[in-house]
Protein backbone atom coordinates (compact mmCIF):
# COMPACT_ATOMS: atom_id res chain seq x y z
CA UNK A 1 0.00 0.00 0.00
CA UNK A 2 1.40 3.40 -1.02
CA UNK A 3 1.12 6.30 1.44
CA UNK A 4 1.02 9.80 0.00
CA UNK A 5 3.24 12.53 1.46
CA UNK A 6 0.07 14.41 2.42
CA UNK A 7 -1.13 11.48 4.50
CA UNK A 8 2.19 10.69 6.12
CA UNK A 9 3.11 12.35 9.40
CA UNK A 10 6.72 11.58 10.30
CA UNK A 11 7.43 11.89 13.99
CA UNK A 12 10.72 13.38 15.20
CA UNK A 13 12.73 10.47 16.53
CA UNK A 14 14.63 12.31 19.22
CA UNK A 15 13.75 10.26 22.31
CA UNK A 16 15.72 7.17 21.36
CA UNK A 17 17.94 5.78 18.64
CA UNK A 18 16.36 4.22 15.51
CA UNK A 19 18.99 1.45 15.54
CA UNK A 20 17.58 -2.08 15.54
CA UNK A 21 19.08 -3.62 18.71
CA UNK A 22 18.51 -7.16 17.46
CA UNK A 23 21.06 -6.60 14.71
CA UNK A 24 23.29 -4.13 16.59
CA UNK A 25 25.78 -6.85 17.59
CA UNK A 26 26.44 -10.38 16.34
CA UNK A 27 25.02 -13.44 18.12
CA UNK A 28 28.51 -14.45 19.25
CA UNK A 29 28.94 -11.05 20.91
CA UNK A 30 25.66 -11.51 22.76
CA UNK A 31 26.97 -14.75 24.23
CA UNK A 32 30.22 -13.04 25.22
CA UNK A 33 28.18 -10.30 26.93
CA UNK A 34 26.35 -12.87 29.07
CA UNK A 35 29.57 -14.73 29.87
CA UNK A 36 31.18 -11.46 30.91
CA UNK A 37 28.49 -10.51 33.44
CA UNK A 38 28.60 -14.06 34.83
CA UNK A 39 32.36 -13.76 35.30
CA UNK A 40 32.05 -10.33 36.93
CA UNK A 41 29.45 -11.60 39.40
CA UNK A 42 31.41 -14.71 40.41
CA UNK A 43 34.46 -12.62 41.27
CA UNK A 44 32.48 -10.37 43.63
CA UNK A 45 31.85 -12.89 46.40
CA UNK A 46 33.11 -16.40 47.24
CA UNK A 47 29.67 -17.53 48.45
CA UNK A 48 28.13 -17.40 44.96
CA UNK A 49 27.03 -20.85 43.79
CA UNK A 50 25.02 -19.97 40.69
CA UNK A 51 24.65 -17.09 38.23
CA UNK A 52 21.89 -16.79 35.63
CA UNK A 53 21.71 -14.01 33.06
CA UNK A 54 19.39 -13.24 30.17
CA UNK A 55 19.44 -10.74 27.32
CA UNK A 56 16.32 -9.61 25.46
CA UNK A 57 15.86 -7.20 22.58
CA UNK A 58 12.99 -6.18 20.34
CA UNK A 59 12.37 -3.71 17.54
CA UNK A 60 8.86 -2.61 16.60
CA UNK A 61 7.98 -0.62 13.49
CA UNK A 62 4.44 0.70 13.73
CA UNK A 63 1.98 2.61 11.57
CA UNK A 64 -1.09 4.26 13.12
CA UNK A 65 -4.03 5.83 11.33
CA UNK A 66 -5.66 8.48 13.53
CA UNK A 67 -9.37 9.27 13.60
CA UNK A 68 -8.59 12.36 11.49
CA UNK A 69 -7.06 10.20 8.78
CA UNK A 70 -3.41 11.03 9.46
CA UNK A 71 -0.88 8.24 9.26
CA UNK A 72 1.77 8.26 11.98
CA UNK A 73 4.77 5.96 11.93
CA UNK A 74 7.23 5.21 14.68
CA UNK A 75 10.05 2.87 15.64
CA UNK A 76 10.39 1.35 19.10
CA UNK A 77 13.64 -0.38 20.09
CA UNK A 78 13.85 -2.02 23.51
CA UNK A 79 16.55 -3.99 25.32
CA UNK A 80 16.94 -5.53 28.75
CA UNK A 81 19.65 -7.49 30.53
CA UNK A 82 18.82 -9.36 33.74
CA UNK A 83 21.04 -11.19 36.21
CA UNK A 84 20.18 -13.45 39.13
CA UNK A 85 22.66 -14.90 41.63
CA UNK A 86 22.34 -17.53 44.35
CA UNK A 87 24.65 -17.43 47.37
CA UNK A 88 25.12 -20.07 50.06
CA UNK A 89 26.48 -19.71 53.58
CA UNK A 90 26.03 -21.92 56.63
CA UNK A 91 23.64 -24.15 54.66
CA UNK A 92 21.38 -21.20 53.87
CA UNK A 93 20.74 -20.17 50.28
CA UNK A 94 19.44 -16.78 49.16
CA UNK A 95 18.93 -15.03 45.86
CA UNK A 96 19.50 -11.54 44.50
CA UNK A 97 18.60 -10.06 41.14
CA UNK A 98 19.12 -6.91 39.13
CA UNK A 99 19.08 -5.62 35.60
CA UNK A 100 18.00 -2.82 33.36
CA UNK A 101 17.81 -1.50 29.85
CA UNK A 102 15.69 0.86 27.83
CA UNK A 103 15.33 2.06 24.27
CA UNK A 104 18.95 1.52 23.27
CA UNK A 105 21.14 -0.60 21.05
CA UNK A 106 22.93 -3.46 22.80
CA UNK A 107 26.16 -1.47 23.08
CA UNK A 108 24.46 0.27 26.01
CA UNK A 109 25.62 -2.64 28.17
CA UNK A 110 29.20 -1.51 28.78
CA UNK A 111 31.53 -3.12 31.33
CA UNK A 112 30.56 -0.39 33.80
CA UNK A 113 26.85 -1.15 33.41
CA UNK A 114 27.45 -4.90 33.72
CA UNK A 115 29.44 -4.36 36.93
CA UNK A 116 26.65 -2.21 38.35
CA UNK A 117 24.00 -4.89 37.69
CA UNK A 118 26.20 -7.69 39.03
CA UNK A 119 27.10 -5.74 42.18
CA UNK A 120 23.47 -4.91 42.89
CA UNK A 121 22.39 -8.55 42.53
CA UNK A 122 25.24 -9.89 44.67
CA UNK A 123 24.76 -7.28 47.40
CA UNK A 124 21.05 -8.06 47.54
CA UNK A 125 21.73 -11.78 47.92
CA UNK A 126 24.34 -11.22 50.66
CA UNK A 127 21.96 -8.97 52.61
CA UNK A 128 19.26 -11.64 52.29
CA UNK A 129 21.56 -14.17 54.00
CA UNK A 130 21.19 -12.27 57.27
CA UNK A 131 17.66 -11.01 56.70
CA UNK A 132 14.81 -11.87 59.06
CA UNK A 133 11.14 -12.27 58.12
CA UNK A 134 9.20 -9.00 58.27
CA UNK A 135 6.65 -8.72 61.08
CA UNK A 136 3.02 -9.30 60.14
CA UNK A 137 0.26 -6.73 60.41
CA UNK A 138 -0.43 -3.16 59.32
CA UNK A 139 2.43 -0.69 59.51
CA UNK A 140 3.88 2.41 57.90
CA UNK A 141 6.40 1.65 55.18
CA UNK A 142 8.70 3.82 53.09
CA UNK A 143 8.99 2.93 49.40
CA UNK A 144 12.14 3.86 47.53
CA UNK A 145 12.32 4.93 43.90
CA UNK A 146 12.28 2.33 41.14
CA UNK A 147 10.20 -0.85 41.20
CA UNK A 148 7.77 0.37 43.90
CA UNK A 149 6.36 2.47 41.06
CA UNK A 150 4.73 -0.77 39.88
CA UNK A 151 2.62 -0.72 43.07
CA UNK A 152 1.45 2.79 42.19
CA UNK A 153 0.64 1.70 38.65
CA UNK A 154 -1.40 -1.29 39.77
CA UNK A 155 -3.14 0.60 42.59
CA UNK A 156 -4.31 3.64 40.61
CA UNK A 157 -2.73 3.61 37.15
CA UNK A 158 -5.36 1.49 35.43
CA UNK A 159 -8.13 3.46 37.11
CA UNK A 160 -6.77 6.66 35.56
CA UNK A 161 -6.78 5.29 32.01
CA UNK A 162 -9.03 7.11 29.58
CA UNK A 163 -11.19 4.16 28.51
CA UNK A 164 -12.38 3.34 32.03
CA UNK A 165 -13.17 6.98 32.77
CA UNK A 166 -14.95 7.47 29.46
CA UNK A 167 -17.17 4.48 30.26
CA UNK A 168 -17.67 5.63 33.84
CA UNK A 169 -16.37 2.36 35.28
CA UNK A 170 -13.35 3.81 37.09
CA UNK A 171 -13.30 4.72 40.78
CA UNK A 172 -11.97 8.09 39.58
CA UNK A 173 -14.77 8.79 37.08
CA UNK A 174 -16.16 12.32 37.50
CA UNK A 175 -13.71 13.21 40.25
CA UNK A 176 -11.43 15.67 38.44
CA UNK A 177 -10.64 18.52 40.82
CA UNK A 178 -11.57 16.55 43.93
CA UNK A 179 -9.28 15.18 46.63
CA UNK A 180 -8.32 11.55 46.01
CA UNK A 181 -5.07 11.30 47.99
CA UNK A 182 -2.96 12.94 50.68
CA UNK A 183 -2.02 16.60 49.98
CA UNK A 184 1.58 15.39 49.91
CA UNK A 185 0.93 13.16 46.89
CA UNK A 186 1.65 14.29 43.32
CA UNK A 187 1.68 11.74 40.49
CA UNK A 188 3.23 12.55 37.12
CA UNK A 189 3.12 10.42 33.97
CA UNK A 190 6.06 11.37 31.75
CA UNK A 191 6.48 9.58 28.43
CA UNK A 192 9.15 11.96 27.14
CA UNK A 193 12.26 10.97 29.13
CA UNK A 194 14.90 10.01 26.53
CA UNK A 195 15.76 6.31 26.17
CA UNK A 196 13.53 5.10 29.02
CA UNK A 197 11.53 1.95 28.41
CA UNK A 198 8.27 3.76 29.18
CA UNK A 199 8.93 6.62 26.76
CA UNK A 200 7.55 6.87 23.24
CA UNK A 201 7.64 9.32 20.37
CA UNK A 202 3.90 8.83 19.88
CA UNK A 203 1.32 6.78 21.73
CA UNK A 204 -0.89 4.10 20.18
CA UNK A 205 -3.47 6.71 19.18
CA UNK A 206 -0.90 8.69 17.21
CA UNK A 207 -0.53 11.50 19.75
CA UNK A 208 2.86 12.91 20.68
CA UNK A 209 3.71 11.81 24.21
CA UNK A 210 3.94 14.44 26.93
CA UNK A 211 4.45 15.05 30.64
CA UNK A 212 1.05 14.81 32.32
CA UNK A 213 0.24 15.55 35.96
CA UNK A 214 -2.39 13.02 37.05
CA UNK A 215 -2.69 13.95 40.72
CA UNK A 216 -1.40 17.23 42.14
CA UNK A 217 -1.20 17.85 45.87
CA UNK A 218 -3.79 15.13 46.39
CA UNK A 219 -6.27 16.42 43.79
CA UNK A 220 -7.16 14.62 40.58
Name what the model sees in each region.
Residues 1-12:
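Single conserved hydrophobic/aromatic residue that forms the stacking wall/gate
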Residues 1, 27, 111, 115:
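Flexible, glycine- and charge-enriched loops at secondary-structure boundaries
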Residues 17-43, 162-165:
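Glycine-rich and small/hydrophobic secondary-structure elements
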Amino acid sequence: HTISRRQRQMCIRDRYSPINPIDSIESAEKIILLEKIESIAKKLNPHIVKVSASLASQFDVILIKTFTGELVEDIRPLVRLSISVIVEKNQRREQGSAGGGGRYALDYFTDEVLHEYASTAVNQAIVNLDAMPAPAGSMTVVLGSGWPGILLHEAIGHGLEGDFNRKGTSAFSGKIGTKVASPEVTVVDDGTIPNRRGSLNVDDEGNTTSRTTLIENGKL
